UniProtKB/Swiss-Prot annotation:
Protein origin, superkingdom: Eukaryota
Positions annotated as glycosylated: T140
Protein name: PILR alpha-associated neural protein
Gene name for this UniProt entry: PIANP
Cellular compartments annotated: Membrane
Length: 282
Protein backbone atom coordinates (compact mmCIF):
# COMPACT_ATOMS: atom_id res chain seq x y z
CA UNK A 1 0.00 0.00 0.00
CA UNK A 2 2.86 2.34 0.80
CA UNK A 3 4.54 1.54 -2.53
CA UNK A 4 1.45 2.82 -4.32
CA UNK A 5 1.25 6.07 -2.38
CA UNK A 6 4.80 7.38 -2.72
CA UNK A 7 4.51 8.47 -6.42
CA UNK A 8 1.49 10.59 -5.53
CA UNK A 9 3.33 12.21 -2.65
CA UNK A 10 6.34 12.97 -4.85
CA UNK A 11 4.16 14.58 -7.48
CA UNK A 12 2.41 16.74 -4.90
CA UNK A 13 5.78 18.05 -3.67
CA UNK A 14 7.15 18.82 -7.17
CA UNK A 15 4.03 20.55 -8.47
CA UNK A 16 4.68 23.92 -6.68
CA UNK A 17 8.13 24.13 -8.33
CA UNK A 18 6.89 24.48 -11.96
CA UNK A 19 7.18 28.35 -12.04
CA UNK A 20 10.95 27.95 -11.78
CA UNK A 21 10.97 26.62 -15.34
CA UNK A 22 9.90 30.03 -16.67
CA UNK A 23 12.99 31.83 -15.40
CA UNK A 24 15.42 33.05 -18.21
CA UNK A 25 18.51 31.00 -18.68
CA UNK A 26 21.92 32.75 -18.27
CA UNK A 27 23.91 33.48 -21.50
CA UNK A 28 26.47 30.84 -22.41
CA UNK A 29 30.12 31.48 -21.70
CA UNK A 30 32.47 32.55 -24.49
CA UNK A 31 34.68 29.55 -24.05
CA UNK A 32 31.81 27.08 -24.42
CA UNK A 33 30.42 28.68 -27.62
CA UNK A 34 30.71 26.48 -30.72
CA UNK A 35 30.30 29.39 -33.18
CA UNK A 36 33.47 30.65 -34.93
CA UNK A 37 35.11 33.55 -33.21
CA UNK A 38 34.91 36.84 -35.10
CA UNK A 39 38.16 38.72 -35.53
CA UNK A 40 38.47 41.82 -33.38
CA UNK A 41 37.95 45.19 -34.99
CA UNK A 42 41.17 46.96 -35.95
CA UNK A 43 42.24 49.67 -33.58
CA UNK A 44 41.78 53.17 -34.85
CA UNK A 45 44.90 55.24 -35.36
CA UNK A 46 45.54 58.07 -32.95
CA UNK A 47 43.69 61.31 -33.52
CA UNK A 48 45.83 63.94 -35.20
CA UNK A 49 45.16 67.59 -34.85
CA UNK A 50 44.55 69.80 -37.82
CA UNK A 51 46.91 72.39 -39.19
CA UNK A 52 47.60 75.76 -37.59
CA UNK A 53 45.20 77.47 -40.00
CA UNK A 54 42.24 75.46 -38.67
CA UNK A 55 39.87 77.64 -36.58
CA UNK A 56 39.42 74.90 -34.02
CA UNK A 57 40.79 71.56 -33.21
CA UNK A 58 39.46 68.97 -35.67
CA UNK A 59 40.05 65.31 -35.06
CA UNK A 60 41.05 63.76 -38.36
CA UNK A 61 41.10 59.99 -38.45
CA UNK A 62 43.62 58.53 -40.83
CA UNK A 63 42.16 56.21 -43.44
CA UNK A 64 43.19 52.62 -43.31
CA UNK A 65 44.42 51.14 -46.63
CA UNK A 66 41.87 48.97 -48.47
CA UNK A 67 42.29 45.25 -47.99
CA UNK A 68 44.19 43.52 -50.74
CA UNK A 69 41.97 41.49 -53.07
CA UNK A 70 42.88 37.85 -53.37
CA UNK A 71 43.69 37.22 -57.05
CA UNK A 72 41.59 34.20 -57.93
CA UNK A 73 41.75 34.40 -61.74
CA UNK A 74 44.60 36.60 -62.97
CA UNK A 75 43.70 38.50 -66.12
CA UNK A 76 46.41 39.93 -68.31
CA UNK A 77 45.30 43.21 -69.82
CA UNK A 78 46.95 44.08 -73.06
CA UNK A 79 47.66 47.66 -73.92
CA UNK A 80 46.77 48.53 -77.50
CA UNK A 81 49.51 50.56 -79.07
CA UNK A 82 48.64 53.16 -81.74
CA UNK A 83 48.77 51.70 -85.23
CA UNK A 84 48.23 48.09 -84.15
CA UNK A 85 45.10 45.99 -84.45
CA UNK A 86 43.10 45.08 -81.35
CA UNK A 87 43.35 41.50 -80.06
CA UNK A 88 41.33 38.78 -81.75
CA UNK A 89 39.54 37.82 -78.54
CA UNK A 90 37.70 40.25 -76.27
CA UNK A 91 38.68 40.94 -72.71
CA UNK A 92 38.13 37.93 -70.48
CA UNK A 93 38.68 35.35 -73.24
CA UNK A 94 42.50 35.40 -73.31
CA UNK A 95 42.65 32.14 -71.41
CA UNK A 96 39.77 30.59 -73.30
CA UNK A 97 36.05 30.51 -72.50
CA UNK A 98 34.72 28.19 -69.82
CA UNK A 99 34.17 24.66 -71.00
CA UNK A 100 30.72 24.23 -69.46
CA UNK A 101 29.02 27.45 -70.55
CA UNK A 102 28.25 28.53 -74.13
CA UNK A 103 30.52 26.15 -76.08
CA UNK A 104 28.85 27.30 -79.33
CA UNK A 105 29.60 31.01 -78.96
CA UNK A 106 31.09 32.89 -81.93
CA UNK A 107 33.94 35.26 -81.12
CA UNK A 108 34.14 38.13 -83.61
CA UNK A 109 37.64 39.23 -84.50
CA UNK A 110 39.16 42.43 -85.84
CA UNK A 111 38.90 43.88 -89.31
CA UNK A 112 41.59 43.66 -91.95
CA UNK A 113 44.62 45.66 -90.83
CA UNK A 114 46.87 47.82 -92.97
CA UNK A 115 49.41 45.05 -93.31
CA UNK A 116 46.84 42.84 -95.06
CA UNK A 117 45.98 45.54 -97.58
CA UNK A 118 42.98 47.10 -95.88
CA UNK A 119 42.26 50.80 -96.17
CA UNK A 120 41.08 52.35 -92.86
CA UNK A 121 39.64 55.39 -94.72
CA UNK A 122 37.37 53.34 -96.97
CA UNK A 123 33.75 52.62 -96.17
CA UNK A 124 34.40 48.89 -95.97
CA UNK A 125 37.89 48.35 -94.51
CA UNK A 126 37.55 44.59 -94.50
CA UNK A 127 35.66 41.59 -93.31
CA UNK A 128 35.00 40.67 -89.74
CA UNK A 129 37.08 37.59 -89.16
CA UNK A 130 35.10 35.35 -86.89
CA UNK A 131 35.98 32.14 -85.15
CA UNK A 132 34.33 29.44 -83.14
CA UNK A 133 34.99 29.14 -79.41
CA UNK A 134 36.17 25.62 -78.72
CA UNK A 135 35.19 24.04 -75.39
CA UNK A 136 38.87 23.53 -74.47
CA UNK A 137 41.35 26.07 -75.70
CA UNK A 138 41.44 29.37 -77.56
CA UNK A 139 39.08 30.47 -80.27
CA UNK A 140 39.85 28.95 -83.65
CA UNK A 141 39.47 31.09 -86.78
CA UNK A 142 37.25 30.10 -89.66
CA UNK A 143 39.00 27.70 -92.06
CA UNK A 144 37.87 29.65 -95.13
CA UNK A 145 38.60 33.10 -93.72
CA UNK A 146 41.54 33.65 -96.09
CA UNK A 147 39.51 32.74 -99.16
CA UNK A 148 36.69 35.11 -98.18
CA UNK A 149 38.80 38.22 -98.45
CA UNK A 150 38.71 40.39 -101.51
CA UNK A 151 41.46 40.80 -104.12
CA UNK A 152 40.97 44.55 -104.47
CA UNK A 153 38.43 45.09 -107.23
CA UNK A 154 35.61 42.91 -105.99
CA UNK A 155 34.66 40.65 -103.16
CA UNK A 156 35.27 36.94 -103.43
CA UNK A 157 33.08 35.03 -101.06
CA UNK A 158 34.84 31.76 -101.77
CA UNK A 159 33.16 28.43 -101.94
CA UNK A 160 29.60 28.24 -100.65
CA UNK A 161 29.02 25.89 -97.74
CA UNK A 162 27.65 22.44 -98.37
CA UNK A 163 24.29 23.25 -96.81
CA UNK A 164 23.51 25.81 -99.53
CA UNK A 165 24.11 23.49 -102.49
CA UNK A 166 21.04 22.46 -104.51
CA UNK A 167 19.88 18.96 -103.73
CA UNK A 168 19.52 17.91 -107.38
CA UNK A 169 23.11 18.69 -108.36
CA UNK A 170 24.84 17.68 -105.14
CA UNK A 171 26.36 14.30 -104.48
CA UNK A 172 24.09 11.43 -103.51
CA UNK A 173 26.21 10.58 -100.50
CA UNK A 174 25.52 13.86 -98.71
CA UNK A 175 22.47 12.61 -96.87
CA UNK A 176 19.75 13.31 -99.48
CA UNK A 177 16.52 11.49 -98.78
CA UNK A 178 15.95 8.80 -101.49
CA UNK A 179 12.21 9.31 -101.20
CA UNK A 180 12.67 12.67 -102.91
CA UNK A 181 13.83 10.99 -106.13
CA UNK A 182 10.93 8.53 -105.98
CA UNK A 183 8.44 11.38 -105.64
CA UNK A 184 9.92 13.26 -108.61
CA UNK A 185 9.87 10.12 -110.80
CA UNK A 186 6.23 9.33 -110.00
CA UNK A 187 5.20 12.93 -110.71
CA UNK A 188 6.87 12.85 -114.16
CA UNK A 189 5.14 9.56 -115.02
CA UNK A 190 1.72 10.94 -114.03
CA UNK A 191 2.23 14.03 -116.21
CA UNK A 192 3.23 11.93 -119.24
CA UNK A 193 0.22 9.59 -118.87
CA UNK A 194 -2.19 12.53 -118.59
CA UNK A 195 -0.69 14.12 -121.73
CA UNK A 196 -1.11 10.87 -123.69
CA UNK A 197 -4.76 10.54 -122.63
CA UNK A 198 -5.52 14.08 -123.77
CA UNK A 199 -3.93 13.49 -127.21
CA UNK A 200 -5.88 10.22 -127.63
CA UNK A 201 -9.17 11.95 -126.82
CA UNK A 202 -8.52 14.71 -129.35
CA UNK A 203 -7.61 12.15 -132.05
CA UNK A 204 -10.86 10.20 -131.54
CA UNK A 205 -12.98 13.33 -131.84
CA UNK A 206 -11.27 14.32 -135.09
CA UNK A 207 -11.92 10.84 -136.56
CA UNK A 208 -15.61 10.97 -135.64
CA UNK A 209 -16.01 14.26 -137.47
CA UNK A 210 -14.50 12.83 -140.67
CA UNK A 211 -16.71 9.70 -140.84
CA UNK A 212 -20.15 11.40 -141.34
CA UNK A 213 -18.83 13.54 -144.19
CA UNK A 214 -17.48 10.44 -145.99
CA UNK A 215 -20.75 8.50 -145.58
CA UNK A 216 -22.81 11.35 -146.99
CA UNK A 217 -20.59 11.48 -150.09
CA UNK A 218 -20.97 7.71 -150.67
CA UNK A 219 -24.79 7.88 -150.44
CA UNK A 220 -24.93 10.70 -152.95
CA UNK A 221 -22.79 8.71 -155.38
CA UNK A 222 -25.05 5.63 -155.11
CA UNK A 223 -28.20 7.70 -155.74
CA UNK A 224 -26.70 9.18 -158.88
CA UNK A 225 -25.98 5.68 -160.29
CA UNK A 226 -29.60 4.33 -159.90
CA UNK A 227 -31.85 4.29 -163.15
CA UNK A 228 -34.78 6.68 -163.48
CA UNK A 229 -38.35 5.56 -164.46
CA UNK A 230 -41.20 7.50 -166.13
CA UNK A 231 -44.28 7.36 -163.91
CA UNK A 232 -46.44 9.78 -165.94
CA UNK A 233 -50.12 8.73 -166.69
CA UNK A 234 -49.43 8.68 -170.41
CA UNK A 235 -46.64 6.26 -169.95
CA UNK A 236 -46.65 2.50 -169.72
CA UNK A 237 -48.75 0.97 -166.96
CA UNK A 238 -46.82 -1.48 -164.89
CA UNK A 239 -48.78 -4.54 -163.77
CA UNK A 240 -47.97 -6.87 -161.02
CA UNK A 241 -46.26 -10.21 -161.47
CA UNK A 242 -49.63 -12.04 -161.32
CA UNK A 243 -51.43 -9.89 -163.88
CA UNK A 244 -53.32 -11.81 -166.68
CA UNK A 245 -53.75 -9.03 -169.17
CA UNK A 246 -50.79 -8.20 -171.31
CA UNK A 247 -49.09 -4.91 -170.93
CA UNK A 248 -50.49 -2.38 -173.37
CA UNK A 249 -47.88 -0.62 -175.47
CA UNK A 250 -48.29 2.46 -177.58
CA UNK A 251 -48.81 2.16 -181.32
CA UNK A 252 -45.60 3.82 -182.22
CA UNK A 253 -42.81 2.77 -179.90
CA UNK A 254 -39.53 4.38 -180.25
CA UNK A 255 -36.58 2.11 -180.52
CA UNK A 256 -34.33 1.80 -177.50
CA UNK A 257 -31.54 3.52 -179.24
CA UNK A 258 -33.70 6.60 -179.76
CA UNK A 259 -34.67 8.15 -183.08
CA UNK A 260 -32.21 7.52 -185.79
CA UNK A 261 -30.88 10.47 -187.67
CA UNK A 262 -32.67 10.95 -191.01
CA UNK A 263 -35.88 9.26 -189.97
CA UNK A 264 -39.04 11.41 -189.56
CA UNK A 265 -40.67 11.60 -186.19
CA UNK A 266 -44.07 9.91 -185.92
CA UNK A 267 -47.11 12.12 -185.80
CA UNK A 268 -49.14 12.31 -182.63
CA UNK A 269 -46.29 11.15 -180.39
CA UNK A 270 -45.80 13.25 -177.29
CA UNK A 271 -42.62 15.17 -176.85
CA UNK A 272 -41.66 13.53 -173.52
CA UNK A 273 -41.55 10.06 -175.13
CA UNK A 274 -38.56 10.97 -177.22
CA UNK A 275 -36.14 10.92 -174.32
CA UNK A 276 -37.86 8.20 -172.29
CA UNK A 277 -35.70 5.78 -170.38
CA UNK A 278 -36.66 2.12 -170.82
CA UNK A 279 -38.54 0.55 -167.91
CA UNK A 280 -36.87 -2.24 -166.00
CA UNK A 281 -39.17 -4.63 -164.13
CA UNK A 282 -37.63 -5.87 -160.94
Amino acid sequence: MESRMWPALLLSHLLPLWPLLLLPLPPPAQGSSSSPRTPPAPARPPCARGGPSAPRHVCVWERAPPPSRSPRVPRSRRQVLPGTAPPATPSGFEEGPPSSQYPWAIVWGPTVSREDGGDPNSANPGFLDYGFAAPHGLATPHPNSDSMRGDGDGLILGEAPATLRPFLFGGRGEGVDPQLYVTITISIIIVLVATGIIFKFCWDRSQKRRRPSGQQGALRQEESQQPLTDLSPAGVTVLGAFGDSPTPTPDHEEPRGGPRPGMPHPKGAPAFQLNRIPLVNL
